[in-house]
Amino acid sequence: MKIETTIFTFKISNSFEDWVKIFDSPEVCNFHKEVGIKPLYRGKSISDPNEVLVIHQAEEGVVKHVFSDPETIKIIEKSGHIYSTTKTTIWHSH
């Protein structure tokens, strides 16, 4: 199966530092491992500190499936991620 790199940009309702505490928490790290998602990068925009970029890698279709699940979306929104602002692009290396 192909490996996809997925790039998310979105707004947050809290500070980047507070959002990172949740994103880097043991619970979220375990969730990523359980579903087969490898976070590669997370950062905030220089021009807008409430805009975040996250890059994940996983087998083809995994990220799309996981992040379209209504239960996962509820958990994501608890972190301060404003899900309705999410823009997603998917990339393949070959």
Ranges and model annotations:
Residues 1-73, 82-94:
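Short S/T/G/P-rich N-terminal loop/turn motif that feeds into the first structured element of a domain
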Residues 77-79:
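Short, exposed beta-strand-loop hairpins at the edges of beta-sheets
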